[in-house]
Amino acid sequence: MKINAVFEGGGVKGISLAGAVRAAEMQGVQFEQVAGTSSGAIIATLLAANYSGLDIKRIVENTPFSSFLKRSFIFNLKVISPALRLLVKKGLYSGEALEYWVSRLLEAKGVRTFGDLPDCKLRIVASDITNGRLLVLPEDIKIYGMDPKKLSVARAVRMSASIPYFFDPVVVRYTKLHSSLSIKNKDKPQLQQAHIVDGGL
């Protein structure tokens, strides 16, 4: 039986979805189009890259998720508290280790960008907290002047899994035309930035 599925988040607990996927496949279920948010985006992404439920279960069981909790040594100094990092970076941890982990798993399947996946195979939900907008990736990345097919899948997963104040938000910089009353400065492009976080908000 072929189905479409949406995987919700739930932090590390959401990773337990790997067992549910394995159980479903043992009952003959095949996942066609998949979508996910937060930790559910990780499961959906691995399925879209043709990892089986058993593969995902083994990956989860053998991954020390504490390895994602890394930050620059300067923010580990006693004179510089994690609170300062939170103030400066908007998160306790960067999220780079998570993105790298996902990218390595995807590269093993020949996947880097959404252009490497069949159309409509994967959708990832994230939140633009700067503009108060829910994003469905890759399509909505067009809002920022980017090509959906060129968007890194691992970066999209990091966006969706960036739990506010825990992981740094992913900053997207883009150019926006600004209309001015002055004819000389009319439609002058301005550099903007948006902070993208966990799609479960």
Language model segments and positions:
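Catalytic nucleophile loop
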Residues: 41
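Patatin-like phospholipase
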Residues: 1-37, 45-201
